[in-house]
Amino acid sequence: MLGRSLLTWVLAAAVTCAQAQQVPPWTEDCRKSTYPPSGPTYRGPVPWYTINLDLPPYKRWHELLAHKAPVLRTLVNSISNLVNAFVPSGKIMQMVDEKLPGLIGSIPGPFGEEMRGIADVTGIPLGEIISFNIFYELFTMCTSIITEDGKGHLLHGRNMDFGIFLGWNINNNTWVVTEELKPLTVNLDFQRNNKTVFKATSFAGYVGMLTGFKPGLLSLTLNERFSLNGGYLGILEWMFGKKNAQWVGFITRSVLENSTSYEEAKNILTKTKITAPAYFILGGNQSGEGCVITRERKESLDVYELDPKHGRWYVVQTNYDRWKNTLFLDDRRTPAKKCLNHTTQKNLSFATIYDVLSTKPVLNKLTVFTTLIDVTKDQFESHLRDCPDPCIGW
């Protein structure tokens, strides 16, 4: 059923989206006065949990997953059903359950032990917890923004769009996995010695990070980058014994936890070999400290930085290289830039960034949450989102 409904949706969307991306009601004038969040595009707040880094890795996630185990099981079952819909023999999930646990020892610390602890506390097979974590390396469709006002103050915003082609619910026009991720969305305060090391918004059960900040120092978001030399190849290489690259979610978390400066973080994100192509959107705490790092798995292709002295007071990154045209079915870059230009540099705030991220198609059916970050003021907030019809699928 999932496979058939997905195929129907893809065929229909390919026809309609080509015409709809730049046509009302799928797009709209730049939104205003959407903040503080309310109304039909606001699903609700994201709950906070503390992750104690002083605990052994095996135990760090037990308290959180004791609350979230039922919804995590629901999502893992949905992913299994989707896989089985495309490979009815069940051999893919059999391989996940039988082969992946044997690779846990090759996952770098502390991530392997954290996954083992999550599997035990939830009762979900370890292989499926590992695959759940791999899953985030491959399906992240996002919009990230860094801005700088006339006084050199930086803001960082992002829409987390996730779940493309992962089951379409024809009864309510939503992506199955996107909707099931919303109750799994959590704000995390990672602490050591009862003091915050970094904060992040993530999904319960995932030990990497995609969105976070280190108070007073830096902010970091991760967007997927589509490439022929893509994440599937990197994951397969890792599974077959080539372990010289880091998972992108792991390197993001490591930078948030351990980096001591914007420049150090930029150097790590630019030079470290990674399993999947990606965009790292990195912000600092001083004028000009904001960039988009475009990565292949083994090298950096481009570092595009804020340059306010020459009029570049924002950077916008979706899922396409900045020097290339976006796919005509999926242009979130143009409306985001249009709305930022309409906002103007002198009016930058959490409210106006949220307005930009609330404007269709920047906001779309894949949007799980919106995050706003002010590094220097130690402000970090995330909000669950909805995109009621009429709304584009991505």
Curated annotation (Swiss-Prot):
Disulfide bonds join C30-C339, C387-C391. The keyword Signal applies. GO terms for molecular function: fatty acid amide hydrolase activity; hydrolase activity, acting on carbon-nitrogen (but not peptide) bonds, in linear amides; N-acylsphingosine amidohydrolase activity. Pathway: Lipid metabolism; sphingolipid metabolism. It comes from the Eukaryota. It is found in: Lysosome; Secreted. The record marks D161, N319, R332 as: Important for catalytic activity. GO terms for biological process: cellular response to tumor necrosis factor; ceramide biosynthetic process; ceramide catabolic process; fatty acid metabolic process; keratinocyte differentiation; lung development; regulation of programmed necrotic cell death; regulation of steroid biosynthetic process. Residues 1-20 form the signal peptide. Its main location: other. Its EC number is 3.5.1.23, 3.5.1.-. Glycans are attached at N194, N258, N285, N341. The keyword Glycoprotein applies. GO terms for cellular component: extracellular space; lysosome; membrane; nucleus. It holds the Pfam family NAAA-beta. Lysosomal ceramidase that hydrolyzes sphingolipid ceramides into sphingosine and free fatty acids at acidic pH. Ceramides, sphingosine, and its phosphorylated form sphingosine-1-phosphate are bioactive lipids that mediate cellular signaling pathways regulating several biological processes including cell proliferation, apoptosis and differentiation. Has a higher catalytic efficiency towards C12-ceramides versus other ceramides. Also catalyzes the reverse reaction allowing the synthesis of ceramides from fatty acids and sphingosine. Belongs to the acid ceramidase family. This is Acid ceramidase. It comes from Rattus norvegicus (Rat). The gene is Asah1.
